[in-house]
């Protein structure tokens, strides 16, 4: 008799995705981050749902409702801090996942890669809107500064900003719509994740060597299920440690001051996971130029498959490209640091140099190095 998991209309979809899925035998721990992102998304939706039961999206009560959650709701403090730090975990896994894709040439699966870029934008938008909800000083001023960037769009900019605000400044209408969208977006993200997986399973997974692994496949279960569970345990341990011992480590103390439109914080900055893009934005003196550079800092990922010049897919056997990749990582860490610093000497020039280097490595140095390595292969 055929197993029910192979015949049942619903179970066979799950079976072909997570049980009998043929997977390359050589996948390293860098392939764990996809499933970790799934767990992060689940944790965020679950904690967010319970937080939404107690949160009020009104400018007069939003800050107090968050305080009420932390003080009066049973384990409300735990929900709030898991949700806030879970977002940080989400982005750590996201950046590792994208980095893995860049290093091992996973971007050659263009549909999967492009859906992934869409997912990245959607998650970033969700996180930004979520940061506005506690209605602290950094929430309010962060929302004001970032939404105001749209006014740089020629002709329609100012109208667009006022349309998003629902008035002439960030106010009650803005907070209400941000809450509505923050609630909606994770479900759109979940739908996109399914499309992402659909396209991935059309081609099968890439592997560290970048060589087709059709002759050497193993079933996903039990080999990679057990490997993923180990990943879950490590990540959830790290998240629990962060939440229970230093929940405010990655947050901004200014967000414990209720939003006040009459007093600007000394340094307006977003959450740490947006600092690299914020540094690129600030490094260009022109407003529209800064906005374009900000968008391009993420959208540049879509160009990567087009400028792939190497005869090899993965960087596993390309030492010069590896050096460039890790230089890119160092540049991103530098940008993250600069994004959190005040706009003064020497931070301005460091930020500008790092921004130039970021685009230079991806657009020019990587393709040239690939061509050089192709030439060296003939020796």
Swiss-Prot record:
Ligand binding (a ubiquinone): 201
PROSITE patterns, per the entry: CYTB_CTER, CYTB_NTER
Keyword tags: Electron transport, Heme, Iron, Membrane, Metal-binding, Mitochondrion, Mitochondrion inner membrane, Respiratory chain, Transmembrane, Transmembrane helix, Transport, Ubiquinone
UniProt-recorded name of the protein: Cytochrome b
Residues where heme b b566 binds: 97, 196
GO BP field: mitochondrial electron transport, ubiquinol to cytochrome c
Subcellular location: Mitochondrion inner membrane
Binding of heme b b562, residues: 83, 182
